[in-house]
Curated annotation (Swiss-Prot):
InterPro entries: Ankyrin-DD_containing_protein, Ankyrin_rpt, Ankyrin_rpt-contain_sf, DEATH-like_dom_sf, Death_dom. The keyword Nuclease does not apply. Keywords: ANK repeat, Repeat. It comes from the Eukaryota. It holds the Pfam family Ank. ANK repeats lie at residues 60-89, 93-122, 126-155, 159-190, 194-223, 227-256, 260-289, 293-322, 326-355, 359-388. This is Ankyrin repeat and death domain-containing protein 1B. The gene is Ankdd1b. The keyword Repeat applies. PANTHER family: ANKYRIN REPEAT AND DEATH DOMAIN-CONTAINING PROTEIN, ANKYRIN REPEAT AND DEATH DOMAIN-CONTAINING PROTEIN 1B.
Length: 521
């Protein structure tokens, strides 16, 4: 054999062994049943030879014994025990075979280990003992065996969690009953490192049965955790409507705020829990901005893009023009975000378009500043529409316009021909400044014209500006239910554009025979 080849083969052997060990380690981590109990630290980088020499810090016989405990292979466990294996050996996470047997709910493996005097007091690197794992996994029989073997019933992990915390968090009712009724461990009902008692943890997970059990055992609390959250806030945060319903039977303060001055309604709104929002509204949750609260519920729903929640709040008569700390309305916020759907919803709800924020800007000015041209056009359409309604209030009371009203961009087949005509007019006929003349003729305000011009894409931007102004005009023309082509012809003549008017007349004569009534857009 080539000496260099042999030398290379020998050098690779430890690395291959390390790779196999690392693969087994990753597979083991992926299948640990208590992986949600503690955050696993990132493994430190080891050189391959060190990893190969001490996989998980165990001897080969010890690793085999732990694997046998994981799979409840009692025959192999017995054989290895006869070979004097150290049954209390710990891996690099400081876990013993008993940790794995309890975590897998393997009654037979646990019985074998306890009968052979396995230690029950070993805590892993996260402070988890076998009593914690039994409380989490919910095996009543294993819990009995561990207590009988002398396991520390009051042990805490690094997060200050004891057996009662873990049982409550994972909805293990029998374990809670045993700890409180049989062992009388009422002193386990204490805050963990985050200031949360078992009742908080049950509420956070939405475990209705556990909440009711803890209430029955007089282990409920209205205390706040270190973040200022009550059990009600934690349940609302995760949208647990049934849990919130049970919690409200214990105290009626549905509007209580946490340390950030956020109520349960605001929390549910921010996270888009529509069913819970509707329930809280039915419980008379306060819709008004609370003192020192940064964002009212409607603002939170808009900021977090929760259209269903927005509709629920508006149906409950939330003030559509409520102001936040910047004196902005929900429409300001939706316009700034460029959220077309929510802008449409708020516009149709009849919001006040004239309100200015602390900087003196209307929602239109905010949308223009943020370069949201679609929203700018919607807001101008709305301003013109509501001005028209005000002017013709009596004549449109019974109009069917409202049922089909939209301020969004029109893509309907009914208006395709007239939109094509307007595009040709804007891009091939109108000269610079012509569209502003038409806009002023059509009673566009200077603010509206400036908002359209805010979108700048170069010296030819006036084509796009003109087309947008023409489409906004079309929206209003369709609302009057007049013939838009005829109306445009007459207005072009009045504005001093006879050649353009003639092109419109020719277009109208071609389409009169096949014209259809245009829908409001």
């Amino acid at each position: 054999m080539n000496p260099e080849s042999a030398q290379g083969h020998g050098a690779r052997a430890p690395m291959l062994q390390a790779a196999r060990g690392l693969k087994a380690n990753l597979r083991d981590v992926a299948t640990r049943p208590w992986r949600s109990l503690a955050r696993m630290p990132k493994p430190e980088v080891q050189d391959p030879e060190t990893a190969a020499a001490g996989h998980e810090g165990l001897l080969a016989i010890e690793r085999s014994f732990q694997n046998a405990a994981k799979s409840s292979n009692l025959d192999l466990m017995e054989k290895l025990f006869e070979k004097k294996v150290n049954i209390n050996a710990v891996n690099n996470m400081n876990r013993t075979a008993l940790h794995f047997a309890v975590g897998r709910n393997s009654l037979s493996a646990v019985d074998f280990l306890l009968s052979h005097k396995a230690r029950v007091d070993v805590a892993d690197k996260h402070g988890l003992t076998v009593i914690h794992l039994a409380a989490w996994s919910g095996s009543f029989e294993i819990m009995l065996m561990l207590v009988k073997a002398g396991a520390d019933q009051r042990a805490k992990n690094q997060e200050g969690m004891n057996a009662l915390h873990l049982a409550a968090q994972n909805n293990n009712l029998h374990i809670v009953d045993y700890l409180i009724h049989d062992l009388h461990l009422h002193d386990l009902n204490q805050p963990n490192e985050r200031g949360r008692k078992p009742f908080h943890l049950a509420a956070e997970r939405g475990h209705v049965e556990m909440i009711e059990k803890l209430i029955f055992l007089n282990l409920h609390t209205s205390e706040k955790d270190k973040d200022g959250n009550t059990a009600l806030h934690l349940a609302a945060m995760h949208g647990h409507s049934p849990a919130v319903q049970v919690l409200l039977t214990q105290w009626s303060e549905v509007n209580e705020s946490n340390e950030l001055n956020v109520s349960a309604l605001q929390t549910a709104t921010r996270n888009g829990h529509t069913a819970l929002v509707n329930f809280l509204l039915g419980e008379n949750a306060d819709l008004q901005q609370q003192k020192e609260s940064k964002e009212p519920p409607l603002h939170l729903a808009v900021i977090n893009n929760r259209p269903a929640v927005v509709n629920s709040l508006l149906s409950a008569r939330h003030d559509v023009d409520v102001l936040d700390q910047r004196r902005q309305t929900p429409l300001h916020v939706a316009a700034d975000l460029g959220n077309v759907e929510l802008v449409e919803t708020l516009l149709k709800a009849g919001c006040n378009l004239k309100i200015t924020d602390k900087q003196g800007k209307t929602a239109l000015a905010v949308a223009a500043r943020s370069q949201h041209s679609l929203v700018v056009d919607m807001l101008i359409k709305a301003e013109r529409y509501y001005a028209w309604r005000e002017e013709h209030r009596e004549s449109i009371q019974d109009s069917a316009v409202s049922s089909t009203l939209t301020f969004k961009q029109d893509h309907s087949l009914e208006t395709r021909q007239i939109r094509t005509l307007l595009w040709n007019l804007a891009y091939r006929q109108l000269k610079k400044k012509d569209w502003q003349r038409l806009a002023r003729l059509w009673s566009f305000t200077e603010d509206q014209i400036r908002a359209i011009e805010e979108q700048w894409s170069g010296n030819d931007s006036f084509h796009e500006h003109g087309y947008r102004a023409l489409l906004i005009w079309l929206h209003g023309a369709l609302l009057t239910q007049l013939d838009p082509a005829k109306q445009l012809y007459e207005e072009l003549l009045c504005a001093g554009f006879p050649e353009l008017a003639e092109k419109i007349r020719q277009f109208k004569s071609k389409t009169d025979s096949s014209s259809k009534k245009c829908a409001v857009s």
